[in-house]
């Protein structure tokens, strides 16, 4: 599964790249995973694009 750790800086890159998997939390200060078992190609792109390296596979 995919998760976003506390290093997230809310840049929203993952949400823009892969909106079927990531969204911002209600406070808008962290991305959250809405589809943790997704194998969409955009997940790898989101992981590679995260400036905080906050997206991890568990």
UniProtKB/Swiss-Prot annotation:
Molecular function terms from GO: 3 iron, 4 sulfur cluster binding; electron transfer activity; iron ion binding
Cofactor list: [3Fe-4S] cluster; [4Fe-4S] cluster
UniProt binding sites for [3Fe-4S] cluster: 8, 14, 50
PROSITE patterns, per the entry: 4FE4S_FER_1, 4FE4S_FER_2
Start and end residues of each 4Fe-4S ferredoxin-type domain: 2-27, 30-58
Keywords from the UniProt entry: 3Fe-4S, Disulfide bond, Electron transport, Iron, Iron-sulfur, Metal-binding, Methylation, Repeat, Transport
UniProt modified residues of type Cysteine methyl disulfide: 11
S-S pairs: 18-42
Co-factor binding details: Binds 1 [3Fe-4S] cluster in its tetrameric form. Binds 1 [4Fe-4S] cluster in its dimeric form.
Purpose: Ferredoxins are iron-sulfur proteins that transfer electrons in a wide variety of metabolic reactions.
Subunit structure: Homodimer (ferredoxin I) or homotetramer (ferredoxin II).
Protein's name in the database: Ferredoxin-2
């Amino acid at each position: 599964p995919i998760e976003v750790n506390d290093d997230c800086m809310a840049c929203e890159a993952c949400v823009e790249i892969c909106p079927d998997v990531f969204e911002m939390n209600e406070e808008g200060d962290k991305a959250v995973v809405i589809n943790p078992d997704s194998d969409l190609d955009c997940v790898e792109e989101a992981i590679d694009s995260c400036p905080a390296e906050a997206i991890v596979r568990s």
